Each structure stands twice: as structure tokens, then as C-alpha cells.
């Protein structure tokens, strides 16, 4: 909490480093978008596969889209959080930790550059810029993958039937809630990664130890936020009662 407060106080200073914010945003997109989008497409394919073979036995293959619609706001944010924790969170610990033990952070302070603003706050702002783009495209690819497989590969349902069921069990409000949940996970993951990287000590061994700690804590954060958000946003849905 103390570290988070320091980050918030340093955010106004980060406005002086717009180019660094954009650079970090570009790095996040280039290095993380492919794996995030690929796994969300896999999730969409899995939803269509399970939906087809399970519901076909019950004579309800027309409702295959239920699996994708619920997956968008239930499994989707968790998958996003786990990937972000492994790819981005651990990367931040390694990057900032190596800078700490090689005294690069101390050198920034000596030069009069606020290390928290330049190294941490800029990354927080970058993740705020990048996450909506990654999430919207990821959820779109998840829907598109399931849509194509269900209609043209498994022949479970027609295009109109698929879209009708999908939007019956998922509204724009559900989508925005899923994005908000994912962004909350992302901010928490980046803060944890920056904390363990910024405070690393003990040489390369210490950096490795902090990387492992950050991954464990981020997995807990994703699980806790996921459970709370499911009950808060979707637990009372009469059309798709989850958690009741």
C-alpha cells in the first residue's frame, strides 16, 4: 500500500515522460499481444468444441454460443490475468531488478530524475493505455473463433441463431464489466511486478527470488479479483445465474 501511494504521488511527474510512456506501451503490445490473443482464441475454440459435443447430446446444439458468452466474462479475464502475470509481471521484476542491482536506478536519482516516476509510473500509465486495446481485440477474436468453428466447422447452429443466443446471454454491460475486471487485474499485476523489481536486492539470486514471489502473489490477485467480480457483477444475473 505504501508503494502504491508513492506511485500515485509520482504520477503527475510522469507527464514529463510521455515518450517513455508511449515506448513502454509499444513494448507491451509487441511483446504480449500475440500470446494473449492466441490463448483467448484457444479459449473461444474450446468453448465451441465443448458446447457442440455437450449440447448436441441433449438436443440443444443451437445454444452453443452460451459457452462463449459466459466464457467472455468469466474465464476471459482470468486467462488475461494469468498471461499478464507470467509475461508482463515477471518481465517487470526481471527488468527493474536488474537495474536495481546494477545501480542504474541509483544513477537516475543522482542525475535528478525521479526513478519512481520514470520507471514505475510510466509503466502504470502504459498499461492503462494498452489494456483496453488488448482486451477488446482479444474478446473479439475469442468471439470470432467460436463463431467460425460453431457455424462452419461443427455446423452446430446458423449464424443468426448463434448471434441471437450469444447476445441474449451477454450484454454490453457484461462486456464492460469484464473489461473493468481485467483492467483491475492488470493494474494490480503491474504494481506487484514493479514493487518486487524496484525493491530487489541480493544480486541475481535476489532478482530470481523476487520474480517467483511476484508470480505467486499475482496468481492470488487474479483469483481473488476474479471471484469477487463474478459475484459482484454476474452472480445475480437471472439469465445466467453464476455463483448462486
Language model regions located:
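Hydrophobic, aromatic-rich alpha-helical transmembrane segments
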Residues: 17, 21, 25, 29, ...
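Short, membrane-interfacial amphipathic segments enriched in basic
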Residues: 1-19, 196-201
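Generic alpha-helical transmembrane segments of integral inner-membrane proteins
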Residues: 37-41, 45, 128, 132, ...
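Active-site cofactor/substrate anionic-group-binding motifs, chiefly glycine-
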Residues: 24-79, 83
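Selective transmembrane-helix segments that form parts of the transport pathway or gating/packing helices
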Residues: 29, 33, 37, 84-88, ...
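Membrane-interfacial helix-loop-helix connectors in multipass membrane proteins
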Residues: 50-73, 137, 141-183, 192-210, ...
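A hydrophobic alpha-helix feature that marks transmembrane segments and, especially
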Residues: 82-100
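Short cytoplasmic-facing helical segments at TM-TM junctions of multi-pass membrane proteins
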Residues: 96-121, 204-207
Amino acid at each position: 500500500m505504501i508503494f502504491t501511494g508513492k506511485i500515485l504521488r509520482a504520477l503527475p511527474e510522469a507527464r514529463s515522460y510521455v515518450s517513455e510512456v508511449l515506448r513502454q506501451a509499444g513494448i507491451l503490445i509487441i511483446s504480449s499481444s500475440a500470446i494473449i490473443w492466441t490463448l483467448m482464441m484457444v479459449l473461444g475454440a474450446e468453448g465451441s468444441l465443448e458446447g457442440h459435443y455437450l449440447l448436441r447430446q441433449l438436443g440443444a446444439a443451437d445454444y452453443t454460443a452460451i459457452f462463449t458468452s459466459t466464457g467472455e466474462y468469466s474465464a476471459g479475464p482470468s486467462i488475461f490475468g494469468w498471461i499478464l502475470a507470467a509475461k508482463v509481471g515477471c518481465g517487470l521484476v526481471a527488468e527493474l531488478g536488474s537495474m536495481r542491482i546494477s545501480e542504474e536506478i541509483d544513477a537516475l536519482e543522482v542525475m535528478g530524475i525521479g526513478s519512481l516516476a520514470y520507471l514505475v509510473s510510466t509503466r502504470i500509465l502504459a498499461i492503462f493505455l494498452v489494456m483496453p486495446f488488448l482486451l477488446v481485440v482479444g474478446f473479439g477474436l475469442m468471439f470470432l473463433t467460436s463463431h467460425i468453428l460453431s457455424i462452419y466447422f461443427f455446423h452446430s447452429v446458423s449464424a443468426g441463431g448463434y448471434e441471437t443466443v450469444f447476445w441474449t446471454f451477454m450484454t454490453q454491460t457484461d462486456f464492460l464489466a469484464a473489461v473493468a475486471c481485467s483492467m483491475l487485474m492488470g493494474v494490480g499485476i503491474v504494481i506487484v511486478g514493479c514493487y518486487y523489481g524496484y525493491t530487489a536486492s541480493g544480486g541475481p539470486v535476489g532478482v530470481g527470488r523476487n520474480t517467483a514471489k511476484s508470480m505467486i502473489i499475482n496468481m492470488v490477485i487474479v483469483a481473488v479479483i476474479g471471484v469477487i467480480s463474478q459475484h459482484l457483477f454476474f452472480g445475480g444475473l437471472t439469465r445466467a445465474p453464476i455463483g448462486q
